Amino acid sequence: MLKSLRYGKEFEELYTGNYSRLYYYAYQFLNDAEVSRDVVNDAFEYVWKNYENFRKMNVVAILFLSVRNKSIDTFRHNKVEE
């Protein structure tokens, strides 16, 4: 339980310290506030589910890469629908 509490605190700091930057990064690709929030939240969910594996890596870089890839995928998907 202490381990999960520690991870929760680390993740909370990661979230509060990086959410805004990731949101604006996604928004540059998507120009849609709601979709940008969804993309960023998906990236954080991915990291949370795999946090044990990522702890020794540059998690912020993983988040930016995840947001970038998801933003590009979403942009392409939206273009096809138009």
How would you label these PLM feature ranges?
Residues 4, 41-58, 77-78:
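Sigma70-family region 2
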Residues 65-82:
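Arg/Lys-rich amphipathic alpha helix in sigma70-family domain 2
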Residues 1-24, 28:
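A short, charge-rich alpha-helical start-of-domain segment used by transcription regulators
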Residues 10, 21, 25, 35, ...:
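Amphipathic alpha-helical recognition patches that constitute DNA-binding helices
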Residues 27-31, 52-55:
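Amphipathic alpha-helical interaction elements
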Residues 15, 23, 33-49:
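Conserved RNAP core-binding helix
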